[in-house]
Amino acid sequence: MPVMPIPRRVRSFHGPHTTCLHAACGPVRASHLARTKYNNFDVYIKTRWLYGFIRFLLYFSCSLFTAALWGALAALFCLQYLGVRVLLRFQRKLSVLLLLLGRRRVDFRLVNELLVYGIHVTMLLVGGLGWCFMVFVDM
């Protein structure tokens, strides 16, 4: 989104939006109502590097933030995957032990469904944040 230079006629009007229009021009003097000392592109040239630097900082910080979130969610996904494998092994051993003791087996259906839904949501978030991260890198 490039910065458009404000034409002289618009910059010399002191209406309700004067503070917005003169944000890059410095303080407005009351004795200077009709004309300003700036040419059309002076404001653009003076603020171009600052605008570019602020834009770079914004995109770079957003990219770092989404990359950190992506890494955390990827680690969470790996932990969930390993946790499910350990929990399934525990469930199998517990079920065999309860069968050998002649007791009723425990129903783990709700726990398993919640774990699968949690992994699914984490996987979707990893994919979406990876896409956001690549969008910020491309900018």
From Swiss-Prot:
Q: Which domain of life is it from?
A: Eukaryota
Quote any Pfam family the record assigns: TM250
Q: How does it sit in the membrane?
A: Multi-pass membrane protein
Q: What induces it?
A: Up-regulated upon HHV-1 infection.
Q: Which UniProt keywords apply?
A: Cell cycle, Cytoplasm, Host-virus interaction, Membrane, Nucleus, Transmembrane, Transmembrane helix
Entry keyword Glycoprotein: no
Its GO biological process annotations read:
positive regulation of cell population proliferation; positive regulation of viral process
Residues spanning the membrane: 56-76, 116-136
Q: Which gene encodes it?
A: TMEM250
Q: Which PANTHER family match?
A: TRANSMEMBRANE PROTEIN 250 (PTHR48431:SF1)
What is annotated about its quaternary structure and interactions?
(Microbial infection) Interacts with herpes simplex virus 1/HHV-1 protein CVC2/UL25.
Q: Does the keyword Nucleus apply?
A: yes
- The identity of this protein, by name, is Transmembrane protein 250
Q: Assign the protein's first listed, main location to one coarse class.
A: membrane
Where in the cell?
Answer: Membrane; Nucleus; Cytoplasm
Q: What does this protein do?
A: May play a role in cell proliferation by promoting progression into S phase. (Microbial infection) Promotes human herpes simplex virus 1/HHV-1 proliferation.
Q: Say which species the protein is native to.
A: Homo sapiens
